From Swiss-Prot:
It comes from Methanosarcina mazei (strain ATCC BAA-159 / DSM 3647 / Goe1 / Go1 / JCM 11833 / OCM 88) (Methanosarcina frisia). Pathway: Cofactor biosynthesis; adenosylcobalamin biosynthesis; cob(II)yrinate a,c-diamide from sirohydrochlorin (anaerobic route): step 8/10. Pfam families: Methyltransf_31 (PF13847). The keyword Cell cycle does not apply. This is Probable cobalt-precorrin-6B C(15)-methyltransferase (decarboxylating). GO terms for molecular function: cobalt-precorrin-6B C5-methyltransferase activity; protein methyltransferase activity.
Amino acid sequence: MSEIVSVSGGPTKPEIIAVSLSKLGLKDGDRFADVGCGTGSVSIEAARIARNLTIYAIDARKEALLATETNFKNFGIENARILAGEASDILGSEKTIDSIDCAFVGGTKNIGSILAKLVEKKARSIVVNAVRIETVVRTIEAMKSLDIFDEVIHVAVSRSFPIAGETMFKPENPVYIVVGKKQS
């Protein structure tokens, strides 16, 4: 099994990916945007859940794009486009991406604009991961203004490690998972 090539700030922890993807409700054949893709680890797991997924991995950081490209190659992810630039610009172009079914947002720069573009692209579900309270508040406000806010989940994971012949837990940084769903 290949190891994920990492970048600063990533990859997203497996437990966070599991909860985030469960909230997305991916279906076979979906068009999936991974905004602020980092290492591409969320896309890799998404591809394991839904067959024939079309992936749009978006990031402005060169190191992230290179890591994603390497990880996609190592994990056999073929039906993916890696897109360089600001997500709000890329999502705003009809030529680049015509529609999106589900989106994971790991990078939260310009979150209001990104969410608006995803709604324009007809995304039925959007999940945003955030670690800062201010980002959570901005995300909730933006989702409410777009009439897509569903819920926020606070996830705190601790990992065991040995100490003095016994086991202790060390907490990871908590993550807020903000969920938006298209209202029927």
